[in-house]
Structures are given as C-alpha cells and as structure tokens.
Design a protein with these regions (language model features):
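Glycine-rich, Lys/Arg-enriched anion-binding loops that position phosphate/diphosphate groups
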Residues: 150-267, 271
Length: 325
C-alpha cells in the first residue's frame, strides 16, 4: 500500500487538490465514490506530518519536504527561488507550458497535474488527454497555484471592486478550530472529498462534451439558415457552438423542452458575440412579435412564455412563435 504525505496543521487548496488529482489519475489510488468506502479501506495511507523520517520513507510527498523531483514523486514548491526582477518562477522539470504561458509559479497542485499529464501521455493511456488537462488548468489549477503563492490577480495598487470567493476560500473553510488535532485529519479528508467532486465534475463534463459534439456537428452540417434548431438542449451549449466556429453563423438557437408542469415549450437563445461574453452576437429577442401570455385580457394562454430581461433567452409554446422572437 502506497503512502502519501502532506504537511500537518492548517491546509490549503493546493495540497488538497494535489491529493485529489492523485486519487483520480495515479494508478492504484482510485476509490469508488459510489460505494461510500470507509477511509480505513482506502488503497493508500494518507499521513499529515512534517517529520523528516516519515517524509523520506513516503511513496509520494506533496507540499512539504523541500523537493521537486517527479522521478521520486516529490512535489513541493516552497524551495523555489524567484529570479531577480520577476514575480514568478518556472522550475526545471515541468513538462507542460501552462505556468510559463500564464507567468504563474506552480504550487503542489500544478506540479502534480503536470506530472500526471506527462505520465498518461507517455504511456498513451488516453485517460488524461491534453484538452482535459487544459480545462483543469483553466478552471481550477492556475488560480489555486497563484493564490497559494500569493500572486495577485491585479496590481496591488489597484483596489478590487469586490472580493470574489474562490475554490481556495471554500477549501479553507474545512479547516477545524484546532489545526493540530486528530479532528483536523478528518476535516482534511472532507476537503479532499469536495475536491474530488469538482474534479469528477470537470472530468465527466469533458467526456460528455466530446461525445455530444459529434452529434452536434452533424446537426449543424445538416441545416442552413441563421436559426439552429436542436432536438434537445446540451450542457455547455454555447461552448460547443463556439468550438464549431458557429457563433457568428446563427442569430437564434432553438430547442424543445418541457416546462415545470410538463407542458411543451421551445427555448430560444441568442448566441454571445464572443465565448463567455455577455454581449449579444445578434439582435436581442423581441417578445412584442409574439402573442402575449394572456392576450386581450383573457386567461387563455398565448404563444409567449417569457423573455429574459437581458433579451438573450426566452420561450414560446410553438416552434412557429419561436422563429418570431
């Protein structure tokens, strides 16, 4: 049974997610989340300590020990020295360029993911492809690494309009009142469970999108005009539209679904101008072109279900009305 060591005391997101990534992608450490396996039955030992003898004997060490050596499975970052005049450091031994591209010093989390990507890439397992790793770095890891290394999002002379809550903040909430108690070890395990949830969410979403995209492309290729009609709604819909280079091709995207009462409706969405933008890429929805919900003061339902105040999404009762929005 392998032993993973992290430091004791207060924990942060970097070593919590480092352990979670190892559980997800390092051979022999996987656990079955659905079976609610007792932690005593995990296929590894997790030790929180700064004892140098224990650290030296461990199979994998994260965020403690003062060494970064992927061959020895040592993933600490505290010993890195920044070059003069530079606020970040890129250590020798990294396999990818994510940190260099973003000018972010890696923490234990980024070091572990970089290693795991290289491990699976070199063995051609297909379990951790580059596009999934890109998603992990973009959505989670770069931010975790930057925060753990004290790197500001903006210049320290600029004040933030508001302070966002990050995944690093949320993980910190799981620390107990006594960071050096046995209870703290249980809290660390709870934090790892939370991290695993988010990793599984991103992982499963990636494979779902890969599967759906093939059908989505076929739908796009089979239609003409500036209204894309889908047979169903897709998670990450606008990401797939963007991936298909079709954001500027369509003024409206329409799909059928049932409302909360089980009645048929047709949702209509305006694509954004750019991926992730709140600016519309086509004219806003106009509900005045559709029969109102209660026309002429009567209680008989009309064709219009709703139009969002932002005019980017709405719904009608019929496909014909959907084309008028």
């Amino acid at each position: 049974m392998k032993t993973i060591v992290v430091h004791d005391g207060p924990f942060q997101a970097d070593e919590v997610f480092a352990v979670a990534f190892l559980i997800m992608y390092y051979p022999g450490l996987q656990i079955d989340m659905k079976s609610l396996m007792a932690r005593d039955d995990y296929p590894f030992d997790l030790i929180r300590t700064r004892d140098e003898d224990i650290i030296a004997k461990a199979d994998i060490v994260c965020d403690v020990g003062g060494k970064y050596n992927t061959h020895a499975l040592r993933f600490d970052h505290h010993q890195f020295q920044k070059p003069e005049g530079q606020d970040y450091v890129i250590p020798k031994g990294l396999h990818g360029t994510w940190h260099e591209d973003m000018r972010i010093t890696p923490s234990a989390c980024g070091l572990v993911l970089d290693y795991l990507w290289y491990y699976h890439e070199s063995k051609n397992t297909g379990d951790l492809p580059i596009h999934l790793v890109n998603r992990f770095f973009k959505r989670l890891v770069i931010g975790i690494d930057a925060i753990d290394n004290g790197m500001s999002q903006v210049s320290r002379s600029d004040s933030l309009r508001y302070r966002p809550c990050t995944i690093s903040n949320i993980i910190a909430h799981y620390n107990s009142d006594d960071a050096f108690s046995e209870e703290q070890d249980d809290h660390f395990a709870q934090a790892v469970d939370v991290a695993l949830f988010h990793l599984r969410y991103i992982d499963s979403g990636y494979w779902r999108d890969e599967f759906n995209f093939e059908t989505f492309k076929e739908t796009i290729n089979s239609q003409s005009g500036d209204h894309l009609v889908l047979e169903q709604w897709y998670p990450s819909l606008m990401n797939m539209v963007s991936r298909a280079n079709a954001l500027k091709k369509y003024k409206r995207i329409i799909w059928p679904q049932l409302d909360g009462k089980g009645k048929q409706e047709y949702r209509v969405q305006v694509p954004p101008k750019d991926p992730g933008s709140f600016e519309l890429g086509a004219p806003p929805l106009d509900g005045s072109k559709v029969n109102p919900k209660f026309p002429d003061g009567h209680k008989t339902e009309g064709d219009l279900v709703f139009v969002h105040s932002g005019k980017w999404i709405g719904a009608t009762r019929t496909m014909e009305a959907a084309y008028k929005l």
